[in-house]
């Protein structure tokens, strides 16, 4: 196992120590790795834990690391307060709100890591009441009643006018930038996620509309709402899938999903206990979705293969076989993420017998076939909180993208001149990236250019 992955597992409490003591150079590599993946705060927890068992990080690296960790803790305190403030203000004005990603994810982390998660901006999912919102127009003299997405967009633009900011923010298909709060970027979402395929996207929007009410009511002790655990597991998979086509994802997003899965699985177990007592669960009487139900929803969005890839990466990086992973574990045998095979095919069985009996295939070629058969028969554990079997083939591709690109693909040097060029060059870069994904996710990739044109028209209408 990679020393970098072991280091992250130590930070998460999944492993007590590393398999080898890092050299000074390796400590620098670990620091840069955590920096690229936006895991510096979490990584410093590993530095502290290793110090307790006598493994010392060089003083200069440790001091620099500590500075980053302290800054991250203060940023989390600030954003927690701001999330409560903006939720209170928006709800007072008639909107219903729910924090997405970011500070909502923070509550899924264990107490020891909660304030060490690297924060980003504030993402707020807002919906309007059925009666709409009555707001002053641009002249601030007459009032107009707005409904649905238009109401959210106009409300955000009104915030700029009320604060005296001369700006006309451009609305995207799923969100619009609101005025920042003391330097913190705020994105107001009227759609929590989206897909390029029209049919899949229609299904997704309908599903989130159906579950919006339970999320808006799911209040936390920090003064804002967050998604229920079942909806969160689906939403985060949609979020990861979207960013794969945008620029990439990093291990910070995969760690968010790991802890979201753990919280969801705990709720599933608690739900079973409560149902056996004739009670309901998930806060508001909403039943917690089972793994089969979660996968049915995700497959209806066309993301079945991608889920298997994510499960492989999580199993490889966070949830692999380590000394502290608890609970009964299921098994998977095939490397392509397909259905579990409980027997070897007739041809492989015949080859296997010939090799064992010293038959004509018991040569170098036979040895290779024997190794292949053993590899196919080998049982690999995966944790009970996973929602499907890992897909090794797609998972290795995804992990390679993550390691090359870092957080949201910011460190990806492939076609850098195109990526950082003008609008035309950036469009070519994006098309090349999408075409790399055609083999793995053909439906979404082939709809991407069409959606891009549709999005241009949509923005012209809503500017």
Q: Which functions belong to the PLM regions below?
A:
Residues 1-120, 126-132, 136-270, 278-329, ...:
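Conserved NTP-donor binding/palm subdomain of two-metal-ion nucleotidyltransferases/polymerases, i.e.
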Residues 279, 339-340, 360-361:
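Intrinsically disordered, low-complexity proline-rich tandem-repeat tracts
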Residues 339, 348-351:
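N-terminal leader/targeting signatures
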């Amino acid at each position: 196992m990679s020393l970098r992955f072991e280091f992250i597992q130590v930070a998460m409490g999944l492993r007590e120590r590393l398999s080898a003591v890092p050299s000074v150079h390796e400590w620098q590599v670990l620091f840069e790795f955590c920096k690229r993946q936006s895991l510096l705060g979490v990584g410093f927890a590993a530095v502290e834990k290793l110090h307790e068992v006598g493994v010392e990080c060089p003083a200069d690296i440790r001091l620099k690391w500590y500075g980053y960790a302290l800054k991250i803790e203060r940023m989390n305190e600030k954003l927690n307060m701001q999330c409560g403030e903006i939720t209170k203000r928006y709800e007072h004005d008639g909107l219903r709100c729910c924090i997405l990603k970011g500070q909502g994810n923070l509550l899924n982390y264990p107490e020891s890591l909660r304030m060490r998660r690297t924060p980003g901006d504030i993402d707020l999912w807002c919906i309007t009441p059925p009666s709409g919102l009555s707001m002053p127009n641009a002249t601030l003299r007459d009032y107009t009643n707005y409904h649905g997405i238009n109401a959210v967009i106009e409300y955000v633009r009104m915030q700029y006018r009320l604060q005296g900011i001369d700006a006309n923010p451009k609305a995207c298909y799923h969100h619009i930038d609101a005025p920042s709060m003391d330097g913190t970027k705020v994105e107001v979402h009227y759609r929590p996620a989206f897909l390029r395929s029209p049919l899949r996207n229609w299904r997704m929007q309908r599903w989130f509309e159906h579950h919006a009410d339970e999320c808006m009511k799911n209040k936390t002790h920090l003064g804002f709402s967050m998604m229920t655990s079942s909806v969160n597991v689906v939403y985060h998979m949609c979020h990861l899938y979207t960013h794969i086509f945008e620029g990439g994802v990093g291990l910070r997003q995969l760690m968010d999903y790991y802890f979201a899965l753990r919280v969801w699985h705990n709720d599933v177990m608690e739900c079973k206990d409560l149902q056996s007592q004739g009670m309901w669960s998930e806060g508001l009487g909403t039943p917690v979705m089972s793994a089969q139900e979660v996968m049915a929803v995700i497959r209806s969005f066309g993301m079945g293969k991608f889920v298997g890839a994510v499960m492989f990466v999580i199993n490889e990086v966070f949830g692999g076989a380590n000394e502290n992973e608890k609970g009964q574990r299921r098994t998977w045998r095939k490397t392509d993420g397909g259905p579990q095979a409980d027997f070897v095919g007739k041809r492989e069985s015949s080859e296997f017998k010939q090799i064992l009996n010293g038959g004509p295939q018991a040569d170098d070629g036979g040895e290779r076939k024997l190794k292949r058969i053993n590899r196919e028969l080998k049982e690999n554990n995966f944790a009970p909180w996973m929602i499907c079997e890992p897909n090794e083939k797609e998972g290795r591709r995804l992990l390679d993208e993550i390691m090359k690109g870092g957080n949201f693909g910011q460190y990806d040097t492939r076609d850098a001149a195109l990526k950082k060029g003008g609008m035309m060059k950036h469009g070519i870069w994006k098309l090349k990236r999408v075409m790399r994904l055609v083999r793995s996710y053909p439906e979404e990739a082939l709809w991407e250019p069409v959606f891009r044109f549709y999005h241009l028209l949509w923005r012209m209408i809503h500017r």
